[in-house]
Amino acid sequence: AMFAPFQLAGIVAISGYVYFFEEWKKSLKPSAFQTPWLITHGLEDDLLPVVTTRNQVQKLKDVGLPITWKEFMKDHEIDLHVETSFIRKWVRSKMVRTRRPTYLPPDQTSSSNSKQRFKSF
């Protein structure tokens, strides 16, 4: 997302880390500064300590990336109740209604499962 030549709708990163290379700041594309980010992490994560990721997120914020940072009382996992609810609300808040066609997966009960369907908003 930081190096994509086009703007993404948003980024959700869960219990991860950022690999910083020597020239990473100079390689950022302008679109990276327009892409909203949500980064979540567990306070009890023993695999990737929260302090490390918290410091990495601060580096990203310091260069101006629009990041929402959220810590949860969890290990290196996805909290299926509190965290997914928070993510769902964040994604919905970033969605923009457009007139562009959006792919919808085929209805599993439909006989036309192999056909792609599109919906315009």
Label the model's feature ranges.
Residues A1-P5:
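Short glycine-enriched nucleophile-adjacent loop
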Residues G10-V96:
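The feature captures the conserved acid-bearing segment of alpha/beta-hydrolase catalytic domains
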Residues V82-F121:
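Catalytic active-site module of serine/aspartate enzymes centered on a nucleophile-bearing elbow/loop
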